[in-house]
Amino acid sequence: GLFDIIKNIFSGL
């Protein structure tokens, strides 16, 4: 969902 995309961004930091 949308939160998965947000977690993906944090994973890339």
UniProtKB/Swiss-Prot annotation:
Keyword Iron-sulfur recorded: no
Known role: Weak wide spectrum antimicrobial activity against Gram-positive bacteria.
Species, as recorded: Ranoidea dahlii
Keyword Secreted: yes
Subcellular location field: Secreted
Any Pfam family: Antimicrobial20
Keywords: Amphibian defense peptide, Antibiotic, Antimicrobial, Secreted
GO annotation, cellular component aspect: extracellular region
Protein known as: Dahlein-1.2
Highest taxon above the source species: Eukaryota
Tissue: Expressed by the skin dorsal glands.
Main location: secreted
Cleavable signal peptide: none
One Gene Ontology term from the biological process aspect of the record: defense response to Gram-positive bacterium
